[in-house]
């Protein structure tokens, strides 16, 4: 049992703005836990989750933190972010059928130029499940995107054109193997 302190909203690479519950740290199975996915808007509405409510938290499959229930229902106030927390574009609620046939509501940012979405698309592209390019962390990608070295995926393969500038950045050096 703990207190939900905040709901953070973060855009995914597809534009869905994913909610995460931040709560007072609790120990479950020897691990300190203070965050759990809230999945979608439907989950938040069904549990009537609002900051300040008392919640019950468990671990699913002995690993994944999960908010099981709201112990103080009846105080729900719709708190959908009106704008994307990253780019400020207006949000939209989408409805789709879940695997069980129930209607699921999700919050989306429809801005294709949202920095967070772009960064996450690049992070996925270089990741193990896609191109498996080692050495390009999300932080490095964000730096290269900000500096304009990356605009499209093929730009990754032409970073050598910016070698002199990159070597001037803190933490970058030339390595010979």
Model regions and ranges:
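RNA/tRNA-interacting regions in translation and RNA-turnover enzymes
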Residues: 1-177
């Amino acid at each position: 049992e703990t207190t939900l302190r905040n709901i953070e909203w973060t855009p995914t690479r597809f534009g869905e703005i994913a909610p995460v519950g931040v709560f007072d740290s609790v120990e479950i199975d020897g691990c300190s836990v203070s965050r759990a996915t809230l999945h979608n808007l439907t989950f938040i509405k069904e549990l009537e989750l609002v900051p300040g409510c008392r919640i019950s938290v468990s671990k699913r499959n002995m690993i994944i933190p999960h908010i099981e229930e709201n112990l103080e229902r009846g105080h729900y106030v719709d708190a959908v972010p009106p704008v994307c927390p990253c780019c400020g574009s207006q949000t939209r609620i989408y409805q789709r059928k879940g695997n069980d046939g129930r209607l699921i509501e999700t919050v989306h940012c429809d801005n294709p130029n949202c920095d967070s979405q772009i960064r996450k698309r690049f992070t996925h592209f270089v990741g193990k499940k896609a191109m498996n390019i080692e050495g390009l962390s999300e932080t490095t990608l964000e730096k290269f995107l900000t500096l304009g070295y990356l605009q499209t995926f093929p730009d990754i393969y032409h970073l050598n054109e910016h070698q002199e500038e990159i070597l001037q950045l803190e933490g970058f050096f030339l390595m010979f193997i």
